[in-house]
Amino acid sequence: MSISDWPEAERPREKLLKNGPAYLSDAELLAIFLRTGIAGKSAVDLARELLKRFRGLTGLFAADQGAFCQVPGMGPAKFAQLQAVLEMARRALEEELKSSDAMDSPGPVRAFLRLSLEGKEHEVFVSIFLDARNRVIATEELFQGTLTQTSVYPREVVKRALHHNAAAVIFAHNHPSGAAEPSHADAVLTQSLKQALLLVDVRVLDHFIVGRGATLSFAEQGLI
C-alpha cells in the first residue's frame, strides 16, 4: 500500500508537520527523505530495509556509493542527496563552533566529531585548529589508516598548526571497532603531539576518541 493511501495521521510528513521531527521513528524520517518507494514497497518499507542493511543511521551515513547503490531503488542521485544533507549538517555544526569558545561548547564539538567520524570503516585522524579565544579556525583530516591503526606524524601536525597560526588544537580519531576506549598507543601519541606542539607555543586542549554511539574525551579523563 502506498503511503498516500494511509490515514493522514499516520503519514510521516503529516506527522512531522503536526508533532515535530522528534516524534518520528528513524524509518519515518528516512522515508520523508526517500519520498517514494519501489514496486511492492512503500518509502517506509524501503527505509526500514536500508536501516536493517546498514545497521542503523550511523552505518547508512557512512556507507560508500557502491554499497548504497546496491539497494534496489537507490542510485547515484539519491546517494548525492544524502551526502549533501550530511555535509550541510556538518557545516552547520562547524559554523556554531567558529562563533563560540570550543571548550565552553562540548556538546557541539562532540556532535561535529561524531557526524564526521562515527561509522567510518578505517581510522581517520582529525585536527581542529583554534585561535587564542578557542574559536575554530579550521578542521582538517590529516591522516587515514587501516581498520586498526593510523600513522600520525607530529612534524606534519606542527606544520599545519603553524600554517593556520593556531594557538591551540583539539585532536580526534575514530575506532572502527566501535569501542571508545584509549589504547596505550593513543596515550603515547597524544603526549608526543603535546610535546611537539609545546615547542611552537600551541596548546593541546583535548583528544577525542569516537566509537559507536560514544565519544571519549582525554581531558575529561585526566589524560591530557
From Swiss-Prot:
<comment type="similarity">
    <text>Belongs to the UPF0758 family.</text>
</comment>
<feature type="binding site">
    <location>
        <position position="175"/>
    </location>
    <ligand>
        <name>Zn(2+)</name>
    </ligand>
</feature>
<dbReference type="InterPro" id="IPR037518">
    <property type="entry name" value="MPN"/>
</dbReference>
<feature type="short sequence motif" description="JAMM motif">
    <location>
        <begin position="173"/>
        <end position="186"/>
    </location>
</feature>
<keyword id="KW-0862">Zinc</keyword>
<keyword id="KW-0645">Protease</keyword>
<dbReference type="InterPro" id="IPR046778">
    <property type="entry name" value="UPF0758_N"/>
</dbReference>
<protein>
    <recommendedName>
        <fullName>UPF0758 protein Nmul_A2138</fullName>
    </recommendedName>
</protein>
<feature type="binding site">
    <location>
        <position position="173"/>
    </location>
    <ligand>
        <name>Zn(2+)</name>
    </ligand>
</feature>
<dbReference type="InterPro" id="IPR001405">
    <property type="entry name" value="UPF0758"/>
</dbReference>
<dbReference type="Pfam" id="PF20582">
    <property type="entry name" value="UPF0758_N"/>
</dbReference>
<keyword id="KW-0479">Metal-binding</keyword>
<dbReference type="InterPro" id="IPR025657">
    <property type="entry name" value="RadC_JAB"/>
</dbReference>
<dbReference type="InterPro" id="IPR010994">
    <property type="entry name" value="RuvA_2-like"/>
</dbReference>
<dbReference type="Pfam" id="PF04002">
    <property type="entry name" value="RadC"/>
</dbReference>
<dbReference type="GO" id="GO:0008237">
    <property type="term" value="F:metallopeptidase activity"/>
</dbReference>
<keyword id="KW-0378">Hydrolase</keyword>
<dbReference type="GO" id="GO:0006508">
    <property type="term" value="P:proteolysis"/>
</dbReference>
<dbReference type="GO" id="GO:0046872">
    <property type="term" value="F:metal ion binding"/>
</dbReference>
<keyword id="KW-0482">Metalloprotease</keyword>
<feature type="binding site">
    <location>
        <position position="186"/>
    </location>
    <ligand>
        <name>Zn(2+)</name>
    </ligand>
</feature>
<dbReference type="InterPro" id="IPR020891">
    <property type="entry name" value="UPF0758_CS"/>
</dbReference>
<feature type="domain" description="MPN">
    <location>
        <begin position="102"/>
        <end position="224"/>
    </location>
</feature>
